[in-house]
Structures are given as structure tokens and as C-alpha cells.
A protein has these predicted regions:
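N-terminal beta1-alpha1-beta2 module of alpha/beta enzyme domains
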Residues: 1-72, 176-178
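Hydrophobic faces of well-ordered beta-strands that scaffold small-molecule active sites
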Residues: 3-7, 42-44, 77-80, 108-112, ...
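An alpha-helical appendage that flanks or caps ligand/catalytic pockets
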Residues: 7, 131-172, 204-299, 309-313, ...
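Active-site mouth loops of central-metabolism enzymes
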Residues: 9-24, 83-91, 175-186, 272-284
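Acidic (Asp/Glu)-rich catalytic clusters
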Residues: 35-36, 66-75, 97, 101-107, ...
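Glycine-rich, proline-tolerant flexible connector loops at the mouths of alpha/beta enzymes
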Residues: 41-65, 84, 205-210, 304-315
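Alpha-helix-loop-beta-strand connector modules within alpha/beta enzyme cores
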Residues: 56-79, 137-144, 316-331
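Internal, glycine-rich beta/alpha segment that forms the wall or movable "lid"
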Residues: 86-197, 211, 215-217, 229, ...
Length: 331
């Protein structure tokens, strides 16, 4: 099994209480911790406004961070979960990703999706097209990006994008461009796009849903004549880990108090949300949960530690006791 680590960027109120001028140092240090450790990749979210409610807390922009992490790290791969196609022209996005791929020595992962956060869309002047239109934009955008990365030029007279001889030089270091991660579990459109283009998928990691979405994806692959085994299936997990169950409860208490300071009305709800996840417990319990997920076909876990900006002990415990236990199944 392979592992990715989310670096807190503020979107989930995970830099609250840290002065904005000091937040980059926190993010950089965590990226470098991952770079020295067993993590294959680091990730940020492509969002502009905080969740679970919109606040004035800082949220750092994903692709700016990609460039900064490219310069600050040496080994770890760099991903976004996931870039919203509607937020940037796809030719421009392909150019940005290609440049960062060069800066990083070929370490970019291209997470891409149709987008969902209506408040952001409207606030930034993008409107909010219905889901079918957003997913059609995703499909056209992926076509443009693949052309640019393969050939250095692209044209598309699409319904949503009109690209006329866009040039992308230098090409990405990775032949054909960064691997595409198509995120989301929409069964008619998103998973069809994944079956067409994705090297990786990312959808709900809870057992019943993961199995069902995998079956839908496999069906699309069969219809398209694609080998389902070519696609690596990943999932995102909130991790709450501690040496003992009593200390896990303490960690959950910390989460509740953290949200009480920044969003009091959400404190109990957030504690419950984190407590209900599959990766909550001692290292042994989390290893068991991940082994069960692996049996379903989930071979790439991307892990979020809400306390990471303030306390790295959970990350370090996961590195010591969880990753090695699953190392024999890496691939």
C-alpha cells in the first residue's frame, strides 16, 4: 500500500491561530517531514473558502503551493485533491502543471474534478453551472491538457472551451504529462471520465460505497475496452491515531476544543465526524482497517491529520507503526 499526506493549508481551519506570515513555514516543514519519511506524496485541496463554514481564516491557493513545495522538497510527489477544472482555463492549467513538473523534476500528480463548492464558484464570479455542465467541462478540459502535454500544442472547438493553437513548452518531464487522478464518484459521468483517462481514481473509502463505485468503474472500463487493473483506486481518510484508546479519546477531545475556538457551533459535530471515520484508533486498529480496505482494492491511502500544524506526533506514530505493517503490500 502507498500513502499520501495532506499538508494543512487552512481550508479545513487547520492553520487557525497561526499568524498568516508564519503559516508557510509550518506547511514547508510538514512537506519536508514527509519528504524525509515514508510518504509517497503530499497533497493540498483546491479550494478558496473554508469549510465546514465560510470564514475569514486563511486558505492558501493550491497551485501556488505546488510550486513552493516543488522547490522545498526533493523526493515526494505533489498532488491536489482535487483541482477544479472550472476554476482555471485548461490550457493555462496544463501550462502551470508542466512548469511545476519541470521545477520538481517530474513529481506532479494531476488531481482533477468537476467541482462542487457553490459558494466559491459564485463568489469568484464563475457562476455555478449544473453538474452535467461542470462534468462536460471536465471532459473537454482533460482533452486539452492531454493534447498539450503530449504534443506541445492543442486546439479544441468545444462547447465549453475554445482553444486555438495553444503552446505548452517546455513539456512536462513526465512523458505524456503528470498522471491524471479523476476524483469523485458520480456514476454516469465522473467514473466514465475516469475509465477513459485516469491513472488513479479517488472516491469514498467507506467499505460499501467503495465496493459499489469500484464495480461501476469496472463496468465503464469493460464498455470502453480498458483494463480495469490499470487504474489505481485511492481514498482519502481522516486519521485519528494514538498509542492507546484513552489517548485516542484525548485526541478527539482536542479536535472538539480546536473547533470550539474557531467555529463554536461546529465543535461537537466535527468531533463526531472525525470519530466516525474508519481510521480512528490505535496503530493496530488502523492497520486492520487498512488491510480490510486493501482487500476491497484500495491500494493508495491519502491521510489527513487535523492536528498536523500544531502536533506531529500522530503523523510520526503512523510512520513508525502503520506504514511498515503495510509495506509488504506496496505497489
Amino acid at each position: 500500500m502507498r500513502f499520501g499526506l495532506f499538508v494543512p493549508q487552512g481550508w479545513r481551519l487547520d492553520l487557525a491561530g497561526i499568524e498568516p506570515a508564519g503559516q508557510w513555514a509550518v506547511m514547508r516543514d510538514l512537506a519536508q517531514l514527509a519528504d524525509r519519511g515514508p510518504w509517497e506524496s503530499i497533497w493540498v485541496y483546491d479550494h478558496f473558502h473554508t469549510v465546514p463554514e465560510v470564514t475569514d481564516e486563511a486558505t492558501h491557493e493550491a497551485w501556488t503551493l505546488m510550486a513552493a513545495f516543488a522547490a522545498a522538497t526533493e523526493r515526494v510527489r505533489l498532488g491536489q485533491m482535487c483541482t477544479c477544472m472550472g476554476y482555471r482555463n485548461p490550457a493555462y492549467l496544463a501550462k502551470v502543471a508542466a512548469t511545476i513538473d519541470v521545477i520538481s523534476g517530474g513529481r506532479v500528480e494531476m488531481g482533477i474534478g468537476g467541482g462542487w463548492y457553490e459558494h466559491e464558484w459564485r463568489a469568484y464570479g464563475y457562476g455555478f453551472p449544473r453538474a452535467g455542465i461542470r462534468l462536460a467541462m471536465l471532459d473537454e478540459g482533460v482533452q486539452v491538457m492531454r493534447q498539450l502535454w503530449a504534443d506541445g500544442r492543442a486546439s479544441l472547438d468545444g462547447k465549453h472551451y475554445q482553444i486555438d493553437g495553444a503552446i505548452c513548452r517546455p513539456l512536462p518531464i513526465q512523458a505524456g504529462g503528470p498522471p491524471l487522478w479523476v476524483a469523485g464518484g458520480g456514476e454516469r459521468k465522473t467514473l466514465l471520465t475516469a475509465a477513459q483517462y485516469a491513472a488513479y481514481t479517488n472516491f469514498d473509502g467507506t467499505p460499501d460505497t467503495f465496493v459499489h463505485k469500484s464495480e461501476v468503474l469496472a463496468g465503464h472500463c469493460t464498455d470502453l475496452g480498458r483494463d480495469f487493473a490499470e487504474i489505481t483506486r485511492s481514498a482519502n481518510y481522516n486519521v485519528v491515531i494514538a498509542p492507546t484508546e484513552a489517548e485516542v479519546a484525548d485526541r478527539l477531545d482536542w479536535i472538539q476544543e480546536h473547533y470550539r475556538t474557531v467555529l463554536p457551533g461546529q465543535a461537537e459535530r466535527q468531533r463526531q465526524a472525525f470519530a466516525s471515520g474508519p481510521l480512528v484508533g490505535t496503530p493496530e486498529q488502523i492497520v486492520d482497517a487498512l488491510r480490510s480496505a486493501e482487500q476491497m482494492g484500495m491500494t493508495y491511502a491519502i491521510c489527513y491529520f487535523v492536528e498536523a500544524a500544531y502536533d506531529t506526533s500522530g503523523i510520526e506514530l503512523f510512520e513508525r507503526e502503520v506504514v511498515p505493517a503495510l509495506a509488504e503490500s506496496a505497489g
